[in-house]
Amino acid sequence: MMLSRDLRAEAAVRLWIMFLLLEDLLGACAVGDYQRRVPSAPNTDIRNTLEKPRVTTQEVAGPHTLRYDLMALSLKLPELPQVLIWRYFDDEPFLHYNESSNRTDSWEPRIKRHWRAMTWARETEDLQEMVEQLKRMLAEVTGQKGQDKGLHILQATLGCELQRNGSTRGFWHLGYDGRNLLTFDQKTLTWTMDMPFTQQKKTFWEPRAPRADLVKTFLDDTCPAQLQRHLASLRSEPLDTGSPMVIVTFRNYPLGRVTLTCRAFNLYPHMATRGTLAWLQDRKLVKQKAFEPGTILPSGDRTYQIWVSIWVLPGQEPQFTCNLSYHGGNIEKRAVIVNTVSGEKTRQPSTSGVGGRVKKSLWTTMTTAFMVTSWTRKTGGDSTLLLLWWLLFFSTVLAVLTLV
């Protein structure tokens, strides 16, 4: 059944009124959400607040790992050296040894600068001993009767880990042709087979493994000393990856609010544990988020990054500044919007914040009152007039909530 013209018009007006009411309701919720998430902060001396050092147990005690990966080939190939050694600190490569050139080199420039010639000679000598040990074992294995004279590969993974409580744990694994072979047990000081074996295989391999007393000395003394030496070199000289960077990004939401995100990159370990990233509004601390374990993210190059976000109202962005305070420096980045089309920096209109919301709420109420009053005069609808008074009441409540 078709509605009359008057009923259709009244239904359209009611739908339009409900749309305006819903729009105001969502806007008021957004403001309330903003006020809950970004509370006002007292007038605090920013230097005293941001420069308090925070030291984590991870910075002092670890865990940290020093690991060697060794590979020896039974045949000399023109494309590859017969023996290769890589050394890893916390699973990142930083030192390698090439038997063809008989030299040790580092992928980290600061290791080259910090270590003296005597240190390099000692490191090279230690690696050469590992090379000779690996080559002897491979020669004994391939020299046995019945062994295939083709290409064989002997691999070893060994090292130590510094625990959080200051204790160390060692490990030594051997592999042959890509399969796990033997593992050293530090408690019993014996080698155990890692794969299904017969007594003949056990008798063949275990006597040819490195001597237990030499392995124990390396895992208990040599490796922990090397790990501590490397940790000392890391603490004495900062990473050479450039200065920290601070980037501010924006994200607009349809409910009348903007998310400001501040990201800090290129943070050295001592910066990440003793620095603070915070938002300032008109030079006053708004929301502070200190660097804590669990919030620091590794970047993959031994530096770290962190971010902090707040919600603001459209037009308030120029009032906010992101502040990165760390030992040795201070970086500030203003929240200036970049026009993605022209690349020019712009600012939001000055009408914003609570005043803007109140203005919009009052405008909606007045417009609604005018339209519905005009319609009720033509139709004489008492029900529509009653709806008007309810809408005026709710709009007034929303305006008051916006001011709170």
UniProtKB/Swiss-Prot annotation:
Pfam families: MHC_I. It is found in: Cell membrane. Heterodimer with B2M. Belongs to the MHC class I family. The lineage of its organism: Eukaryota, Metazoa, Chordata, Craniata, Vertebrata. It comes from the Eukaryota. It is a lipid-anchor; GPI-anchor. Disulfide bonds join 160-223, 262-322. Residues 59-150 are annotated as: Alpha-1. GO terms for molecular function: natural killer cell lectin-like receptor binding; receptor ligand activity. Glycans are attached at residues 98, 102, 165, 323. The gene is Mill1. Residues 224-338 form the Ig-like C1-type domain. This is MHC class I-like protein MILL1. InterPro entries: Ig-like_dom, Ig-like_dom_sf, Ig-like_fold, Ig_C1-set, MHC_class-I_related, MHC_I-like_Ag-recog, MHC_I-like_Ag-recog_sf, MHC_I/II-like_Ag-recog. It comes from Rattus norvegicus. GO terms for biological process: defense response to bacterium; defense response to virus; DNA damage response; gamma-delta T cell activation; immune response; immune response to tumor cell; natural killer cell mediated cytotoxicity; negative regulation of natural killer cell activation.
